C-alpha cells in the first residue's frame, strides 16, 4: 500500500503512469499520485459526496485536486492519504522533519480539544515512530479505552424474562399458567438484572472488531486485542447507521469521548467493507472545529487560572443569548454561541476563532459575515471588545475596527483581529508557554488589565 502525506490547501496531481515512483515527485504541498490511484481516489470521494451529501474534502479539477480544510486520513485499496494542516507560510520540502512536526502539533491540538479522545496522559504516549495521524489517534483512543475499562465496564439494569428455579422480581401470571402448570418448582419471572451489554460497550467492541482488521503497528494491535478480551462477555452485534446514542449521565460520562471516537471509526468505514479485504475508510476532522476546541481548552487550562477572578465559558455555556425574540411563539430565535466568553470584574470579552488565511492584499480584513457576527456579539453581550482569532501568518499585523451605531457614528465597541502561532512545537514546554503568553496578552487586552499574567516555561 502506498502511503503519502499532503498538506491542507495542497495539490494532488494525476501522474502520467501507474508506477509508484510517481509519488516520489513533489512535496507535501504538491503531491503527484500514480494515475490509477488518483482515479480511484477521485471516484471514491465523489461517490461518497453524492451518497452522503457531505461537503467536499478535495475540490476536484482537471487532472488535479485541491485539499480543503479537513485533515486526517483517507484510505482506499492501494493508497493511504494523510492530510495535515498548513500552519505557516513555509514552503515545506519532501523531508520528514517538517511533516513530523506538523503531525505532532495536530495531535497536540486534537488531544487538547478532546477530539483525540484522550486526556493529558495520552500526550506522553504518542511515540509511534513514523506513524500516521490515524495510527496515533487509534493508539491514543485505545489507551483511554483501556484506562476506563480497567476502572470498570459500563453497566446498567435491563429487564429480563425467564423460567427460573427461584422466584425473582415479578411473577408473570399468564406465562406461569401456560408453561408451569405441571412444574411447580419453576417460576416464570420478569426482573431487572445488572448487565454489561450496554450501547456503549457494544459500540466499543464494534469499533475494535473493525480496527483489528486494519494494518496497524503491532503495539497498537495488542491494545486492540486487550480491549476485546475485556469486552469478551459483550455480544457481537452488527453495526447499523442511525442507531440513537445513549444518554450520558454521571455514571457513564467518562466513556463519552471513546464512544464518540468509536462512532467516527464505524461511520467512516466504507459501507461495503468486508472482513479480510483491504478496507476503505476515512477519519477526518474539520480544522475550524479543531482550532476552536483547542484554543478554548488551552485558555481554560493554561491562561484563566493565572488571571484572578476570570471565568471562561466555551460555546457560551450557560449564557447562550438569542439575537431575536418571537412574540407569538414567546421564545428566542437564533441563539448566539460564541466560541469563548471570558468574564472578569463585570467586563466581558468574546473570542471567536477562525481557521482562515486572511489576504495580505486586504491588510488582514475579516470577511463581511465574520464582522456581522462579531457586531452581534458586541450588541447582545454588551461588551466593549470582541476579538477574531486567526492562526498567525507572515506579513499580517493585528488591527482594530471600531464598531459604530446611530447616525452620529457613536462607537459601539471594538472588534480586534489577532493572531496566534500554532506552527511552533506545541508539544514542548517552551512551545506551550509561548502560546500561553500570546493568549494571555490577547485576553488581558480584551479585559482591560494593566498587564498580562506571568507565564513561565517549566524548567
Where are each of the predicted segments found?
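Catalytic core segments in nucleotide and nucleic-acid processing enzymes
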Residues: 1-46, 278-459
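Residue(s) in the substrate-gating loop at a strand-loop-helix junction
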Residues: 2-281
Amino acid at each position: 500500500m502506498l502511503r503519502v502525506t499532503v498538506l491542507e490547501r495542497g495539490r494532488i496531481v494525476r501522474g502520467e503512469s501507474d508506477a509508484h515512483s510517481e509519488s516520489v515527485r513533489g512535496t507535501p504541498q504538491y503531491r503527484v499520485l500514480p494515475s490509477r490511484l488518483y482515479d480511484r481516489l477521485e471516484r471514491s470521494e465523489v461517490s461518497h459526496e453524492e451518497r452522503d451529501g457531505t461537503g467536499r474534502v478535495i475540490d476536484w479539477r482537471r487532472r488535479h485536486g485541491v485539499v480543503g480544510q479537513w485533515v486526517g486520513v483517507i484510505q482506499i485499496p492501494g493508497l493511504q492519504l494523510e492530510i495535515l494542516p498548513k500552519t505557516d507560510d513555509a514552503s515545506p520540502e519532501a523531508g520528514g522533519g517538517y511533516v513530523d512536526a506538523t503531525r505532532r502539533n495536530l495531535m497536540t491540538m486534537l488531544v487538547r480539544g478532546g477530539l483525540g479522545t484522550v486526556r493529558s496522559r495520552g500526550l506522553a504516549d504518542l511515540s509511534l515512530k513514523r506513524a500516521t495521524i490515524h495510527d496515533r489517534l487509534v493508539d491514543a483512543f485505545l489507551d483511554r479505552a483501556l484506562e476506563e475499562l480497567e476502572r470498570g465496564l459500563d453497566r446498567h439494569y435491563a429487564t429480563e424474562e425467564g423460567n427460573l428455579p427461584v422466584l425473582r422480581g415479578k411473577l408473570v401470571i399468564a406465562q406461569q399458567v401456560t408453561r408451569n402448570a405441571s412444574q411447580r418448582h419453576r417460576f416464570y419471572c420478569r426482573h431487572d438484572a445488572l448487565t454489561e451489554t450496554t450501547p456503549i460497550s457494544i459500540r466499543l467492541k464494534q469499533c475494535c472488531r473493525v480496527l483489528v482488521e486494519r494494518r496497524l503497528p503491532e503495539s497498537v494491535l495488542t491494545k486492540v486485542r486487550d480491549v476485546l478480551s475485556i469486552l469478551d462477555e459483550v455480544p457481537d452485534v452488527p453495526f447499523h447507521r442511525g442507531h440513537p446514542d445513549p444518554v450520558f449521565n454521571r455514571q457513564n460520562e467518562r466513556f463519552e469521548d471513546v464512544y464518540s471516537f468509536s462512532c467516527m471509526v464505524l461511520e467512516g468505514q466504507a459501507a461495503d467493507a468486508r472482513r479480510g479485504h483491504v478496507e476503505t475508510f476515512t477519519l477526518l476532522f474539520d480544522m475550524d472545529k479543531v482550532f476552536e476546541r483547542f484554543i478554548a481548552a488551552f485558555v481554560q487550562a493554561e491562561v484563566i487560572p493565572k488571571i484572578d477572578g476570570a471565568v471562561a465559558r466555551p460555546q457560551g455555556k450557560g449564557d447562550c443569548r438569542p439575537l431575536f425574540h418571537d412574540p407569538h411563539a414567546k421564545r428566542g430565535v437564533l441563539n448566539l454561541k460564541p466560541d469563548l466568553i471570558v468574564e472578569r470584574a463585570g467586563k466581558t470579552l468574546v473570542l471567536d476563532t477562525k481557521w482562515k488565511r486572511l489576504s495580505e492584499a486586504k491588510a488582514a480584513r475579516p470577511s463581511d459575515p465574520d464582522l456581522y457576527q462579531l457586531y452581534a456579539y458586541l450588541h447582545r453581550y454588551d461588551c466593549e471588545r470582541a476579538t477574531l482569532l486567526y492562526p498567525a501568518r507572515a506579513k499580517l499585523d493585528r488591527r482594530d475596527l471600531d464598531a459604530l451605531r446611530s447616525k452620529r457614528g457613536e462607537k459601539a465597541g471594538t472588534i480586534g483581529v489577532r493572531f496566534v502561532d500554532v506552527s511552533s512545537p506545541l508539544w514542548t514546554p517552551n512551545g506551550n508557554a509561548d502560546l500561553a503568553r500570546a493568549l494571555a496578552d490577547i485576553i488581558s487586552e480584551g479585559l482591560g488589565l494593566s498587564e498580562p499574567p506571568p507565564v513561565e516555561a517549566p524548567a
